[in-house]
Amino acid sequence: MSFTPTDYNAYDFANRRHIGPSPSEMEEMLRVVGVSSLDQLIEETVPASIRQETPLDWAPLAEHELLARMREVAAKNRVMTSLIGQGYYGTVTPPAIQRNILENPAWYTAYTPYQPEIAQGRLEALLNYQTMVADLTGLPVANASLLDEATAAAEAMTMAERASKSKARAFFVDADCHPQTISVIRTRAEPLGIEVIVGHPAQLVPEDVFGALFQYPGTYGLVRDFTRDIAALHEAKALAVVATDLLALCLLKEPGAMGADIAIGSSQRFGVPMGYGGPHAAFMSCKDDLKRSMPGRLVGVSVDARGNKAYRLALQTREQHIRREKATSNVCTAQALLAVMASFYAVFHGPRGLRAIAERVHLNTVRLATALKEAGARVSPEAFFDTITVEVGVGQAGILAAARHRGINLRKVGRDRVGISLDETTDAGVIARVLDAFGIHEPAPAKVGLGFPEPLLRETGYLSHPVFQMNRAESEMMRYMRRLSDRDLALDRAMIPLGSCTMKLNAAAEMMPITWPEFGTLHPFAPADQAAGYHEAIGDLAQRLCRITGYDAMSMQPNSGAQGEYAGLLTILAYHRARGDAERTICLIPVSAHGTNPASAQMAGMKVVVVKSAPNGDVDLEDFRDKAAAAGDRLAACMITYPSTHGVFEETVREVCRITHEHGGQVYIDGANMNAMVGLVQPGAIGGDVSHLNLHKTFAIPHGGGGPGMGPIGVKAHLAPYLPGHPEVTGPLTGGHDEAADEGPVSAAPYGSASILLISWAYCLMMGGEGLTQATRVAILNANYIAARLRGAYKVLFMGNRGRVAHECILDTRPFAEAGVTVDDIAKRLIDNGFHAPTMSWPVPGTLMVEPTESETKAEIDRFVAALLAIREEIRAVEEGEIAAADSPLRHAPHTVEDLVADWDRKYPREQGCFPPGSFRVDKYWPPVGRVDNAWGDRNLVCTCPPVESYSIAAQ
């Protein structure tokens, strides 16, 4: 027998690892769809008039080649000890948390917990986070995270404006706030017509403002009591916001004790690496009467169908996708995974451990300050926690350079001062090197006292709930983390077919580099020459994204898709202002648009005009034409999603763009559905002027159970000068364009959550241009295969002119309402089959939107189809009168182990209820709770850890 080498490429990441169906399976699927080839399907799906002609042509890297390239790039970053502070600090990530949370797909591949029955684990972890924040800030209600401290401050400003009874239109900002926070607040305030007054608290005139923001401790270190300032604000019917530090609050008097209405900050130093700017979970807490005005997601306690304790997202009618143009915030993706990490850091250390860390950080700072003073240095402030500034006069540059020579970054403050912020990684050796940079060779004193007045010492306890007391041993921590993850359904268990969410594979090789210290320990404001590796990676990713989208420049700053929308609209408005067209403020948005679109437009100060949908789901072209003409020289932009939110490539997209440009507007193409376009259609080539990209959808960043995400924006060349800038960076922040942007920032850090950009870069490098295009084609195949398999059982609501859907399809479940079966019933019944429900009731109420992505195998898709077909038969039984809807397995879903072992008095067999067709028997996923009562949870709102008795009841 002669030897013939195989043509099988074992290292073909795109086709062997990322794309689910094999070539032979694709042939079967194409037959079901009714086409002879993938090329024919694409021709029938994507209009020829918009298809790109130039293919993406870079070669792919194998996984081992990718990791070698990453090592080379990582080596170009210089790992220094950064004592710059300014909201970013060195921290120790406990290996138990890194291994069991950050590196665990059970945690990082989950979706936002809108289906509470399959998200009890991460909901409990987020409730722990809320409890931690509420306890430490001394305020009763906290949310489940925001994007970063600066945007949290901006959200707090608009929240204060809504809630304040003052008629003033100005907001006071303490000059001791972090510079990036002040800049982001100015960016947010300008389009809303809010005047920002920056000054010393002594200059505050409470009657002139609706609210004020104080930094505690201040950016230059000052710790002071704001009780009197806050009382004066309240006397004038204004609200007080305190930006604070959770570690400092383990020692310092809490904002709630000062009378603060809102507290915000970052939980980064609770075990989350700096990552050159992120991702990190910001927090917000508030007084009870403000909770309904709070942005972001809020976890609450409710009960299930059997009366057992259950967690859920509370007060969801506050959210942007429901309120749309009436929304007060566009927060969607936040930072759930990082909030979970921070909550486990608190569980890991407990209150005594956190206080010990805070004491060590503070006393080390006192030692350093004392040594500097004894050597004759002028150190301020008198009261501090972990940050001091030293007056050095003309010697500033020399001291900064001497510190860098010793491996330490200090902060340049003005022209003649140096800032020093210590953290939990600071030891005696670091202090000695700092002193050496100042020419001081005497050791710091061993015994010192408090560095702030005793009245500022915290008097109240915190983290008294047993969850923060019971898990000291790592074995117990590991088991607690495992118990919580076992309660959830993430991509490591099953397909998550959420329409418009693109729950694709997050490959292990893509994830690995983010935990490397060469990427994790960099401070976002470190000298640029220390981040050469980051700049190479970010620049290369930006260039590739420009090639993919057809845009000329790419800003990597926005921290989420919604923030990308906001940044893109601000860019458009800045462009119009520069041309003398400041009156252009109208934004045309189709009624079917993503909920964040009108919310973002409202935040940007635009007037939203809603455009109708035609009967086939497309934008109503006549209505669009009429409203564009009516807007005339006041038209700023239109926002469209492509392919449409109805899952179709609309033939008229070029005409929509032409009409908008004809009236002087700019075209914003929402990139949420880019997974149907990569390699096939470039939004910048079909008339788009700006788009955001959801890197946590199309480009493989995991959803993390509700964040992190990234939403960079691509623009045509004429908009590039108006992209977001940053106060800490000079020079260009964009890829593909050499001009420095001078508009205000939208995020705290110059490149947003820079460390997770590495995931998308790795994805692009391993897939290669051809692999990225094939992924798009297979995503379209998988969606059309599902539509074909379900035809006859469910009506597919919208299709293109040739009967095809894009990368997702909408199943119409409204006809079943006549029999009393709801879309909720179908969603919960899918849990019994081990599936997360598709997107419910959006963009059309009473429907399910299904997006399988290219990563799902034919076997998994067939299992999902079998589940839906079995559910259709159960609906048919209700329709034909065999069983009432209220008595059916649909209404009792999901079924728990408690249901399985209880006395069975239901009108369908136990086997049918608990083991429906398509479900696994050996490895079956059992939801920990039955159907959750949402209304009960909102009527009886509890947003911190419930009493310990409820845990023991649940255990029994």
Curated annotation (Swiss-Prot):
InterPro entries: GcvP (IPR003437), GDC-P_C (IPR049316), GDC-P_N (IPR049315), GDC_P (IPR020581), PyrdxlP-dep_Trfase (IPR015424), PyrdxlP-dep_Trfase_major (IPR015421), PyrdxlP-dep_Trfase_small (IPR015422). Its cofactor is pyridoxal 5'-phosphate. It is an enzyme of class 1 (oxidoreductase). Its EC number is 1.4.4.2. One of its GO terms (biological process) is glycine decarboxylation via glycine cleavage system. Pfam families: GcvP2_C, GDC-P. It comes from the Bacteria. GO terms for molecular function: glycine binding; glycine dehydrogenase (decarboxylating) activity; pyridoxal phosphate binding. One of its GO terms (cellular component) is glycine cleavage complex. It catalyses: N(6)-[(R)-lipoyl]-L-lysyl-[glycine-cleavage complex H protein] + glycine + H(+) = N(6)-[(R)-S(8)-aminomethyldihydrolipoyl]-L-lysyl-[glycine-cleavage complex H protein] + CO2. The glycine cleavage system is composed of four proteins: P, T, L and H. PANTHER family: GLYCINE DEHYDROGENASE (DECARBOXYLATING), MITOCHONDRIAL, GLYCINE DEHYDROGENASE, DECARBOXYLATING. Belongs to the GcvP family. The glycine cleavage system catalyzes the degradation of glycine. The P protein binds the alpha-amino group of glycine through its pyridoxal phosphate cofactor; CO(2) is released and the remaining methylamine moiety is then transferred to the lipoamide cofactor of the H protein. This is Glycine dehydrogenase (decarboxylating). It comes from Cereibacter sphaeroides (strain ATCC 17023 / DSM 158 / JCM 6121 / CCUG 31486 / LMG 2827 / NBRC 12203 / NCIMB 8253 / ATH 2.4.1.) (Rhodobacter sphaeroides).
